[in-house]
Amino acid sequence: MAALRNATPFSYRQDPAVPAFPDDKPIFIFDGYCVLCSGGATWLMRHDKKRIFRMSTAQSSLGAALYAHYGIDWDATYLLISNGLPYTKSGGYLHMCAVVGGWWKAVLILYLIPRALRDWGYEIIARNRYRWFGKVEYCQMIPDDLKVTLLDTAAEDAAQPQRSAGGMSFSDAENAAISARS
């Protein structure tokens, strides 16, 4: 795996292209159009009983800016930022399970598998996720009781025409970019 650019703690705070956001908790940034990814985010919201995580989509202005800051393609992986550090692919999911705690810590046994092999498996799923699990035109609806974990980026994107669903907003340009990648 190529090293992430700017992978020092809280480096995004000095990047004027990254909108300010509360970073006192980990933030999970996912593909809002991917059924598997949105399902994973909903799973995290339901199992995060202590409300440790915040969420945003890769298609939001915050998500896009953070992906650009770290030099990664949102279509290749999700992004988890915890204690100001970026995590992606299998290592990020294992870190997330450790933070969620409970019996999910049992998943940490996967650290025994070399990262290259874990990430290879992750990349196969990531490349085929739309074909295997589907894709939605608009971000899926998030139940009201779980919306508290979402970072609201609508104000940042107010200058662009919006399509909104489940508390997450996407501009026509963002929707076109998603459609072009499928």
Question: What residues fall within each predicted segment?
Answer:
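N-terminal leader/targeting and pre-domain segments
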Residues: A2-Q14, V18-P19
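Local sequence-structure signature of Cys/Sec-based thiol-disulfide redox active-site neighborhoods
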Residues: P16-H47
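Short coil/turn segments at beta-strand junctions that form active-site/ligand-binding loops
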Residues: D24-K25, R51, A76
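Active-site-adjacent beta-strand anchor residues
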Residues: F30, S56, Y111
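Short cysteine/histidine-rich zinc-coordinating motifs and their immediately flanking basic loops
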Residues: R46-K50, L150-D152
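Thiol-based oxidoreductase modules, predominantly thioredoxin-like and allied folds used
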Residues: K49-G63
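Thiol/selenol-based redox catalytic cores and closely related redox-interacting motifs
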Residues: S61-S182
